[in-house]
Amino acid sequence: MIVLQTIAVAFAMFSAVPVPQFGWNEKNMRYALCAFPLVGLLCGVLWCVCGVLPLPAPARAAGFCLVPVWVTGGIHLDGYADTCDALASYGDREKKLDILKDPHCGAFAVIRLCSYFAAYLCLAACVQFTPRVGALWTLALVLERAFSGLAVAAFPMAKNTGLAHTFASAADRTAVRNVLAVLAILLCGALLALGGGALAAVAILLFLWYHHVAVQQLGGITGDLAGWFLQKTELWMLAALCACQWGGLI
């Protein structure tokens, strides 16, 4: 029962999928971050469904672009937009944290979101779907969430409030770090075995860059910054997927 509650908590927080509602408590939040990658698995399965449906090419590309947004409800895009505004302000740490708390969408967020979707749609249109490509992308969507959850359990927090702090405080951080680190290693190995080593390399490099930006710019991570990392990683892994396909590696 606790396992199901843990999964439900993860899906209730990180997706728009209707799930039974449980009150958050010490037991069902302890390993909720370990269930976070399952949201990526669902995104990948639906992405593959979109790939095999007899859709016109533009509709298929739009589906590839929108499936992750529909599944997650845009929660990570919200963090991406807020973080783009904060980092573009070039203010001090407190100024950036204040911008992250501001519910309004600034000019830089709008510009970056439009650019993001234009790039994502263009890359999605370039993907030639095959079962192997579907498997690679599903692994990638799971991997980015494994790294995101690992960061919440391992990186310093920028503040003592917010959802990232709530999940980090409630988690058995040692166990979560170990589980997600092992999962990330296995996923990277699977990507490499399928010819998608470039996707794993991109994810690892962005994970390291994420730590650098978080510590240098904000003194640690926040929920918004976690969303920014996930969306950045997804876009660049999609570019790597296209590059692998163009290069004949997959």
Question: Where do the PLM segments sit?
Answer:
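Membrane-proximal soluble regions of multi-pass membrane proteins
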Residues: 1-24
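N-terminal beta-alpha supersecondary unit
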Residues: 9-12, 26-51, 165-169
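Multi-pass membrane catalytic core of lipid/isoprenoid biosynthesis enzymes
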Residues: 29-46, 86-132, 136-137, 174-190, ...
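Alpha-helical membrane-inserting segments
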Residues: 46-54, 67, 71, 123-127, ...
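Acidic (Asp/Glu-rich) catalytic motifs at the cytosolic membrane interface
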Residues: 67-105, 212-233
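Solvent-exposed interhelical
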Residues: 146-180, 218-222
